[in-house]
Regions:
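Helix N-cap/capping motif at the beta->alpha junctions
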Residues: 31-40, 61
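Receiver (REC) domain active-site loop signature in two-component systems and cognate sites
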Residues: 56
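Active-site residues of response regulator receiver
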Residues: 53
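Hydrophobic/aromatic residues positioned on beta-strands within the core alpha/beta folds
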Residues: 76-78
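Alpha4 helix (beta4-alpha4-beta5 surface) of REC/receiver domains from two-component response regulators
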Residues: 62-63, 80-99, 106, 110
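Receiver (REC) domain switch/output surface
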Residues: 108-119
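Conserved sequence signature across two-component system core domains
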Residues: 7-9, 32, 50
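Charged docking surfaces used in two-component/phosphorelay signaling
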Residues: 16-24
């Protein structure tokens, strides 16, 4: 069964690039452009993984992750993992990975596969 990934990023180029990369690798990808759009999409679909930008407009990321407890989340950010930890964003057990932008395409695909137990 095809896994579904929700990509949430306010940067259209990043959002669409990640979508294309993942679709080419066999995933069903849904996108959201900010925190509010993310929460709206989650009412419509339950993805297997959310790739979530840490810094974007709309509902703050800390509020989003409080509402999502049963879906794996991997952060995408230009900030360092230590900065995310300082903000308390890595405390939930469903936070499974952290991708620092810019990221390597093959690394992204490999790590998503590992997260979804496909590699």
């Amino acid at each position: 069964m095809t896994k579904t990934i929700l990509v949430v990023d306010d940067e259209p180029d990043i959002r669409e690039s990640v979508k294309l990369i993942l679709e080419v690798n066999g995933y069903n990808v849904i996108t959201a452009n900010d925190g509010d759009d993310c929460l709206k999409k989650l009412k419509e679909v339950k993805p297997n993984l959310i790739l979530l930008d840490i810094m974007m407009p709309g509902t703050p990321v800390d509020e989003i992750i409080k509402q999502i407890t049963n879906i794996k989340i991997a952060f995408m950010s230009v900030v360092r993992i230590s900065d995310a930890r300082k903000k308390g964003l890595c405390m939930q057990e469903n936070i499974v990975d952290f991708f620092q932008k810019p990221f390597n395409v093959s690394d992204l695909v490999d790590r998503v596969g590992l997260i979804l137990n496909e590699k």
